[in-house]
Structure formats: C-alpha cells, structure tokens
Curated annotation (Swiss-Prot):
<keyword id="KW-1133">Transmembrane helix</keyword>
<keyword id="KW-0472">Membrane</keyword>
<keyword id="KW-0406">Ion transport</keyword>
<keyword id="KW-0812">Transmembrane</keyword>
<dbReference type="GO" id="GO:0005524">
    <property type="term" value="F:ATP binding"/>
</dbReference>
<comment type="subunit">
    <text>The system is composed of three essential subunits: KdpA, KdpB and KdpC.</text>
</comment>
<comment type="function">
    <text>Part of the high-affinity ATP-driven potassium transport (or Kdp) system, which catalyzes the hydrolysis of ATP coupled with the electrogenic transport of potassium into the cytoplasm. This subunit acts as a catalytic chaperone that increases the ATP-binding affinity of the ATP-hydrolyzing subunit KdpB by the formation of a transient KdpB/KdpC/ATP ternary complex.</text>
</comment>
<keyword id="KW-0067">ATP-binding</keyword>
<protein>
    <recommendedName>
        <fullName>Potassium-transporting ATPase KdpC subunit</fullName>
    </recommendedName>
</protein>
<comment type="similarity">
    <text>Belongs to the KdpC family.</text>
</comment>
<dbReference type="GO" id="GO:0005886">
    <property type="term" value="C:plasma membrane"/>
</dbReference>
<keyword id="KW-0630">Potassium</keyword>
<keyword id="KW-0547">Nucleotide-binding</keyword>
<feature type="transmembrane region" description="Helical">
    <location>
        <begin position="10"/>
        <end position="30"/>
    </location>
</feature>
<dbReference type="InterPro" id="IPR003820">
    <property type="entry name" value="KdpC"/>
</dbReference>
<dbReference type="Pfam" id="PF02669">
    <property type="entry name" value="KdpC"/>
</dbReference>
<keyword id="KW-0997">Cell inner membrane</keyword>
Amino acid sequence: MSGLRPALSTFLFLLLITGGVYPLLTTALGQWWFPWQANGSLIREGDTVRGSALIGQNFTGNGYFHGRPSATAEMPYNPQASGGSNLAVSNPELDKLIAARVAALRAANPDASASVPVELVTASASGLDNNITPQAAAWQIPRVAKARNLSVEQLTQLIAKYSQQPLVNYIGQPVVNIVELNLALDKLDE
C-alpha cells in the first residue's frame, strides 16, 4: 500500500503534462509561429474555402490538370480514409490498374506524344497527394488548352508560376500544386 501514493501521484502528474500542458503548449506555439499551416493550409476565396494546399482534389474535367490517382476508400482524396492501395509491385492487379489508367489518360490526352508520366498512374502512399512534377503538368497542356481555349504558352507560364523548387536542389524535384494550379485556371476564366 505504501507504493500506491507515489504511483498515483506520478500517474496524475504525467496525465496533466501529456494530456493537458503538452497539447495546449504545442497548439499555442503552432498558432503563434505557423497559423496558416496549423489551421490546415486552407485556400480561401473571400469567405469560401476552396481547398487545402496540402490535400489533392478530384479534378476530372478536360479543362483541369489531373493529379495523382487517389487510393482512398469511399471517394477520391478522402482525408478521413488516407492510405495507399497496398498493392505490391508484383501484384497482377496493380498491373491491370495501371494499364487501365494509362489507357484512360491516352484516350483523354490524344495529342500528348510522350509516354504517360508515372505519377499520373500511380497513387501516393497517403492517397491524398496534391503535387505532380511540372513535366506531368506539361504533358496535359494540349488537353487543357483545347478545353479552355487557351494557348500552350499561357499554360506553360502558369505551370512555371505555380512550380515549387525543392528546399535543397539535389534533394527532391520541382513540383506543381494541382489544387492551386486549377484554381488559378478558374480565375483566368473570370
């Protein structure tokens, strides 16, 4: 019985620290130092939230750049069901899935001459990826230009404007945020 009091006081102390002080402190510091990121990196137009800069969206029309396929359950880019397809590289189902995606992309992009970029046919580990390479975006330019009646040069400049360079040049590659790029396309129509 003599060991119960120190054990109980240690438990209550750690409960207070890990269940109260630490979460409140990290929330306060996050809101202070990184308010935009701590609140979900939401992209707003006036009072309307159009999306998050961190989570992809299911853009399907010919007038939009398409991102990586989503492997989330129930609906594409479902943040409550984040996860990959869990299909191994050796799984024949993955081969069938990729072949179907390549065929669909070829049909939707008949003017694209180069091979289909790999990130347009493979889902990311989270199933929520919002970035593709500038090359994958450029591959889709003929389709988007035709659907929106824009020039190739306009779309090339837009991709360059929304391309983000890696923090360190030799680690990573440039990426384009598909959500921001497509929202910029919509603004061109206004």
